[in-house]
Amino acid sequence: MTTFSEKEKIQLLADIVELQTENNNEIDVCNYLKDLFDKYDIKSEILKVNEHRANIVAEIGNGSPILALSGHMDVVDAGNQDNWTYPPFQLTEKAGKLYGRGTTDMKGGLMALVITLIELKEQNQLPQGTIRLLATAGEEKEQEGAKLLADKGYLDDVDGLIIAEPTGSGIYYAHKGSMSCKVTATGKAVHSSVPFIGDNAIDTLLEFYNQFKEKYSELKKHDTKHELDVAPMFKSLIGKEISEEDANYASGLTAVCSIINGGKQFNSVPDEASLEFNVRPVPEYDNDFIESFFQNIINDVDSNKLSLDIPSNHRPVTSDKNSKLITTIKDVASSYVEQDEIFVSALVGATDASSFLGDNKDNVDLAIFGPGNPLMAHQIDEYCLTVNIQISTSTFSLIK
């Protein structure tokens, strides 16, 4: 017998979808969850990142082993709300779909974890050991919340970690890292009619970029053996086999120049220009390697005119894809999903696990598994299937 009806579960999700946490204000969700946990006599604690951003930690059970369940409370910007069919911050149920910002990424997964915690406690189905819920702030950008919890030791004693990001029929045991690398070139501004007495920062930046492309292309020729295999993920998401060449490329290091800035007006030689890259490190080419890779090119071009800044730096995470945690989730999920639809894979994206696990990653079984299609994340008219919330809640309740 469940504590909440299906209608009540949807209302709980609706309540936190209405709390607008676009890259901020997670404290509102923390306060809501604190009241909910208090109602069911579950011990919880709010840990502030700053005035408007906070995490909440809740626990049931005691002793070992310790299983951590995690989800983030922030969502990405909804963009122009006029482009949405339904209001992004009002849950709309239509034809078996739950529309709203965060339904997939990832308030749906978070609320499934919260409901699981409450129902296990209320039904006296407490596990042997401890279940610790970690709801985090700031995952979408700098993972401030996860870093705070890791620094305070909330992951030091855990044996397993489930992050309820949207995964469809997938269960993920590992993922790439993510780095933001900004290269800035400086020059000397002068009137564009006399460029020879100035120093065009764009020229220096282009020299860097041309060398980067050449050396990155050469690196990728040798990037052929990978610890992380993302092919099962792509096969499921695109619905067909991918070539060995594409699977090999996707499983390796990737780097994309995604932002370029330079110059302020057409008749002035620019004294500053910048490129920003998103790099996805892998175990073979980790974050330290990437930093050196960029810095070496800067040194080759002109280190007096070029500088490197790394505002975001999340490491790849690996664990045993045949762990007891992964096997248990797969076995339980097969009661609700066709066995041949379930797959185990590495993930191309990054999660709070990068900040959570750190040096402790070799001692923790990791599973990324939650309701929603990952392709719906960050989209206009984001939705999660109602049945996916139900399946995830049922699955989580049996992993204990």
From Swiss-Prot:
Pathway: Amino-acid biosynthesis; L-lysine biosynthesis via DAP pathway; LL-2,6-diaminopimelate from (S)-tetrahydrodipicolinate (succinylase route): step 3/3
Essential cofactor(s): Zn(2+); Co(2+)
A GO molecular-function annotation: succinyl-diaminopimelate desuccinylase activity
GO BP annotation list: diaminopimelate biosynthetic process; lysine biosynthetic process via diaminopimelate
Residue sites binding Zn(2+) 2 per the record: D105, E140, H378
Active site: D74, E139 (proton acceptor)
Co-factor remark: Binds 2 Zn(2+) or Co(2+) ions per subunit.
Name of the protein in question: Probable succinyl-diaminopimelate desuccinylase
Biological source species: Staphylococcus aureus (strain Mu50 / ATCC 700699)
